[in-house]
A protein has these predicted regions:
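N-terminal amphipathic/basic-hydrophobic helices that include classical n-h-c signal peptides
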Residues: 1-11
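Conserved small/polar residues in nucleotide/adenosyl-binding loops
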Residues: 137-143
C-alpha cells in the first residue's frame, strides 16, 4: 500500500485528507451532496458543472451504501471517509454487542459505530482514533434512540 506522510498523520489510498474533510463541512458542498443523492456517482464525478465533483461523488456513493449498513449515519448525512466506512461495523452488528458495565475503551474507534451503541450500555465510553481526519467524523455523528 502506498503511504506518504502529511502534516497530520499518515495518508494512504482510501483515506480522506483534512482539507477534503473541511471542504465537505462547507454549506455549499453539503448542499451539493444533498442535491446529488440518488444520482450515479460516476456521472457526478464526470459532471464539470459540479464543484469538487470527485469528492461529492465519493460522498454520494458512500451515503448510498450507508442506507443499509449505517442508517443513522445516512439520516444524519454524516461525512463518510471511504476507508473508515469500509472498516466500520454495521449498526445491526454494533447493536447486538451484549457487553455492559461502567466504562469501556474503544481503541479503534473509526466512525464510532460501536461506541455509539456501547454508549447505551456503559456509563462512560472512551474512544481513540489514530487517523485525525476520521476523528473529525464525530462532529457529524447521529444520535440513536
Amino acid at each position: 500500500m502506498e503511504r506518504r506522510t502529511e502534516k497530520i498523520g499518515i495518508f494512504a489510498p482510501g483515506m480522506m485528507t483534512p482539507e477534503q474533510y473541511r471542504l465537505l463541512l462547507t454549506p455549499e458542498v453539503r448542499r451539493t451532496v444533498e442535491e446529488q443523492i440518488g444520482r450515479d456517482p460516476a456521472a457526478i464525478a464526470l459532471d464539470k458543472r459540479i464543484p469538487h465533483a470527485a469528492l461529492v461523488a465519493t460522498q454520494v456513493k458512500y451515503l448510498a451504501r450507508a442506507r443499509t449498513k449505517l442508517p443513522s449515519y445516512y439520516e444524519a448525512r454524516c461525512i463518510l471517509p471511504p476507508l473508515a466506512f469500509e472498516q466500520a461495523s454495521s449498526e445491526a452488528c454494533a447493536a447486538r454487542k451484549s457487553c455492559s458495565g461502567e466504562r469501556v475503551l474503544d481503541l479503534t474507534c473509526g466512525l464510532g459505530v460501536d461506541a455509539l451503541y456501547l454508549s447505551k450500555r456503559f456509563r462512560e465510553v472512551i474512544t481513540l482514533e489514530r487517523d485525525a481526519t476520521v476523528s473529525y467524523t464525530h462532529l457529524t455523528l447521529p444520535t440513536i434512540a
